[in-house]
């Protein structure tokens, strides 16, 4: 994936975060070898930090992959005294793979697994949640916001990945559905009085927004 962040900066930021457990490092190797996108250790550490800062006990992930991001959230929830992280993917095999990794990390007890479309699963679950993480198909970002607003508590945190979209958001000739979805989600979150929003330029850009 092309990146807007200089390799030197990325290496420096990664050097500052704690070492990950061997199982998490193995997940990183798998992501590289299979070209499977993961949030990476720097964004993962940010997710862990945000969850710890707000004392999150109930977290909902929209688009969890094979459990890499879930590992950071689940560790935070466990250290916060317990709760649940909802892992949501569209594929049984990914759900099984995530379960294997998270059990190996000793975090399976705080994870609930769902196979289905993320917005529909969120709508079906009882809120409120302390933190929602959104990494679904980018064209669906704007459509997800109503469900997020209905399920996230006041003072809760929304984290959205890929919000710089490898620079495609700056290409005036790119009107593809995914690029348009990232642009519109950014507009919605930065213009709504319901949200206090920052775009953090690490990896592929991460939005951190607090619901008022």
What are these regions (language model features)?
Residues 30-34, 169-172:
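Short glycine/proline- and acidic residue-enriched helix-loop micro-motifs
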Residues 41-212:
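S-adenosylmethionine/decaboxylated-SAM
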Residues 24-30, 165:
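Short, basic/glycine-rich phosphate-binding loops at helix/coil junctions
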Residues 1-24:
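N-terminal auxiliary segments of SAM/dcSAM-dependent transferases
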Residues 9, 29-33, 130:
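A short, mixed-charge helix-start or loop-turn motif at secondary-structure junctions
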Residues 16-19, 32-45:
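Conserved SAM-binding loop and adjacent beta-strand
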Residues 1, 15-16, 35, 173-177:
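A general boundary/transition motif marking the beginning of the first structured unit of a protein
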């Amino acid at each position: 994936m092309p990146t807007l962040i200089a390799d030197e900066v990325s290496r420096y930021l990664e050097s500052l975060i704690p070492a990950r457990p061997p199982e998490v490092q193995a997940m990183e190797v798998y992501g590289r070898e299979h070209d499977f996108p993961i949030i990476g250790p720097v964004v993962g550490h940010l997710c862990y930090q945000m969850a710890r800062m707000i004392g999150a006990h109930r977290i909902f992930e929209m688009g969890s992959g094979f459990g890499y991001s879930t590992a950071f959230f689940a560790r935070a929830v466990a250290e916060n005294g317990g709760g649940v992280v909802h892992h949501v993917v569209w594929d049984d095999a990914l759900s099984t793979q995530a379960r294997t990794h998270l059990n190996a990390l000793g975090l399976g007890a705080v994870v609930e697994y769902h196979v289905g479309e993320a917005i529909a699963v969120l709508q079906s679950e009882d809120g409120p949640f302390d933190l929602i993480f959104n990494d679904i198909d980018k064209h669906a970002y704007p459509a997800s916001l109503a469900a997020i607003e209905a399920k996230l508590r006041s003072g809760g945190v929304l984290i959205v990945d890929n919000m710089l979209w490898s620079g495609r958001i700056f290409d005036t000739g790119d009107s593809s559905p995914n690029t348009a979805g990232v642009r519109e989600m950014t507009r919605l979150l930065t213009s709504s009085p319901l949200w206090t929003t920052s775009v953090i330029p690490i990896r592929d850009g991460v939005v951190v927004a607090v619901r008022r």
